[in-house]
């Protein structure tokens, strides 16, 4: 058994790691080459972009083990959407890479042999962008996702583009 302290430390370590990945100022790409279960789905969901090999399966298996996917839930729910999360959190059924693509959990499916090339192509596009713009873009995505489009949000987004246009990186680009 675990001590109470150990019981809290282990999930906290996973939560901290997922937050570091999610909040990283650099774009992150998940390369999924084999079946992806439970905490592995949290790792994929915490990344900005996910590319997976065709033919693999995904599963949020926690309820079959008497657990809940609490630590990974914020990331997985954002990646797959709330309705899909209801289904897959509660049923713990395996689903295909094609289904993961359909629900938006992954962005692209390729054959296993093409996985490295697909990731290389994405990283080529990413490295063409400004690191400062990537950081600000990621901040924008985190902060306005799910917000109501109202006058305050419109003013905030206008302020953001105005600020980055006059930054050294914005003037250079």
Where are these regions (language model features)?
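Functionally critical, cavity-lining and gating residues within the transmembrane helices
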Residues: 37-38, 69, 82, 170
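Short helix- or helix-capping micro-motifs
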Residues: 84-93
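Glycine-rich beta-to-alpha active-site loop
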Residues: 18-65, 94
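Terminal peptide-recognition signature
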Residues: 27, 44, 100, 137, ...
């Amino acid at each position: 058994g675990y001590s109470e302290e150990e019981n809290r430390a282990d999930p906290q370590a996973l939560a901290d790691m997922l937050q570091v990945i999610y909040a990283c100022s650099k774009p992150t790409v998940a390369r999924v080459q084999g079946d992806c279960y439970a905490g592995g789905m949290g790792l994929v969901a915490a990344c900005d972009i996910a590319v997976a090999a065709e033919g693999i399966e995904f599963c949020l298996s926690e309820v079959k083990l008497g657990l809940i996917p609490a630590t990974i839930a914020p990331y997985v729910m954002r990646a797959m959407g709330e309705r899909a999360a209801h289904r897959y959190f509660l049923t713990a059924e395996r689903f295909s890479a094609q289904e993961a693509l359909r629900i938006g959990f992954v962005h692209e499916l390729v054959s296993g042999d093409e996985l490295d090339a697909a990731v290389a192509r994405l990283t080529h596009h990413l490295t063409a962008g400004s690191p400062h713009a990537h950081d600000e873009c990621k901040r924008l995505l985190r902060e306005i996702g799910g917000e109501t489009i109202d006058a305050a949000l419109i003013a905030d987004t206008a302020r953001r583009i105005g600020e980055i246009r006059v930054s050294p990186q914005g003037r250079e680009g």
